[in-house]
Design a protein with these regions (language model features):
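Charged, often glycine-rich, active-site loop that binds/positions anionic groups
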Residues: 63-79
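Catalytic cores and adjacent binding grooves of peptidoglycan-active enzymes
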Residues: 86-152
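Short beta-strand
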Residues: 56-57, 75, 110-115
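Catalytic and substrate-binding regions of cell-wall glycan-acting enzymes that process beta-1,4-linked
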Residues: 81-84
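Extended, low-complexity, intrinsically disordered C-terminal regulatory tails
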Residues: 43-68
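Extracytoplasmic cell-surface/polysaccharide-interacting catalytic and binding patches
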Residues: 1-47, 139-152
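Structured loop/turn residues at beta-strand edges in well-structured enzyme cores
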Residues: 51, 79, 106
């Protein structure tokens, strides 16, 4: 199923972990609707402006989210978030995604610079107010993932 001219449902639901563990990673109608809005209003415009965007993690069923140790409040489980990467001429350029979203004042709920631009987590609520929250992920002194508000 095509979600936009450049993105498919299989691309946003693909998970090697789900495949390996035999976990069904299929969205219900509400989550599918959320994914269509996320792709249409945020990810496809980004793709049109910047070029090919790779979705490294998209929709996660609750079972898959538990298996990978994801947050119980993860927007991935609602079909409202993706983790993405952008490569240009074979080089990772994820900061360009981050900068583009800020410059273009694109509507989003949360954007996280994950570990010095290793990937970008970005979400969009289908209904309700989007927070436009910008965070940076890092490892704290105990080696746990922590988040801080980004300086922009």
């Amino acid at each position: 199923m095509r979600l936009s001219k450049n993105f498919t449902l299989s691309e946003i639901t693909k998970s090697n972990t789900a495949k390996r563990l035999g976990i069904k990673n299929a969205p219900d109608k509400e989550h599918l609707n959320n994914m269509q809005i996320l792709i249409r209003d945020l990810i496809q415009p980004m793709r049109d402006a910047l070029g090919p965007i790779r979705i490294s993690s998209g929709y996660r069923s609750p079972a898959l989210n538990r298996a990978i140790g994801g947050s119980s409040k993860s927007q991935h489980c609602k079909g409202q978030a993706v983790d993405i990467q952008f490569f240009k001429k074979g080089e990772m350029c994820n900061k360009e995604i981050y900068d583009w979203v800020i410059k273009e004042e694109i509507e989003f709920d949360q954007m996280i610079n994950e570990f010095d631009y290793a990937w970008i987590h970005i979400s969009l609520k289908s209904n309700g107010k989007n927070r436009k929250q910008i965070l940076e992920a890092y490892k704290d002194s105990d080696g746990d993932t922590a988040y801080k508000v980004a300086d922009i």
